[in-house]
Each structure stands twice: as C-alpha cells, then as structure tokens.
Amino acid sequence: MLLGLGHVDLVCSDVERSIAFYEHVLGPLGLGNAAVFEGERGESIHYLRFPRPGSGSIGLRQAFEEQEFHLYAPGLHHVAFAVDSKADVDTAHAGAVAAGAQIIHAPRDFPQYHPNYYATFFLDPDGFRIEVATARDTR
C-alpha cells in the first residue's frame, strides 16, 4: 500500500544558501535539519525533516553544472507544503519576504482549489516555486 511521499530532492546552485533560506522561511513552522548523506556523485545531500515523524523530508543537494530552472520545462513545477493554519501560511510568507524571496501570491484564499484553501506562493533562491497552504478552516 502506498503511504505517501517520502522525500523530494532539489538540486541547488548554492546548497548552503538554500539551506539557510528554507531554515529561515520554514524553520519557524518546524522544518529542521535531520541528516546529511552522501549522494551518488559524492555530493552532500542535506535532508530537512518535517516535524511529524514519518511525514517525509526535503533534500537539498549541490548542482554540478549551472542551468537555469524553467517552471514549464519538463520536470518540477512547484513544491507545496501543507500547514495547520492560516497563521502558519502568514508566518511562512513573512519569512519569505524577510529572506528577499520574490512573492508570486501573497497569502489569500484560493476557493478554486478548495472552499477553505489559503496559500502563499514565492520563489526560492534558485527560482523553484514554493507554495505553503492550508485547507483547514482555522486562523
């Protein structure tokens, strides 16, 4: 039986910058550094874990060649993080603003996705589109 998504790895142009960004933006919501593993090319993969046991992680690894990320090229479109409340969405947005991220959508309702869907969208340092959202009817 499929249980969910275990982890997603993002290849970053500057892994230390990306670690600092994600820890600054999502650290206040519980994302933390779980472990560092060696990748198949000898690179370090930094896994930032979600706070609930068994809920997965996001891996950040150093790129070996420069290549600009394109949102609509084959591959990743965006990564969405689920949070408990609208206040958590607002916290992530404030962290993204403080980190200098390009904001795509400030926190707001997206009823086309779900009646209670509330989200913010921004770009990480490599241009990956990040979404932080809740579908719970809480503040």
Where are each of the predicted segments found?
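N-terminal beta-strand motif that seeds the catalytic metal site of vicinal oxygen chelate
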Residues: 1-19, 79, 136-139
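Short glycine-enriched loop/turn motifs at secondary-structure junctions
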Residues: 2-4, 72-76, 114
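Vicinal oxygen chelate
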Residues: 12-17, 79-125
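Short glycine-/small-residue motifs
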Residues: 57, 131-132
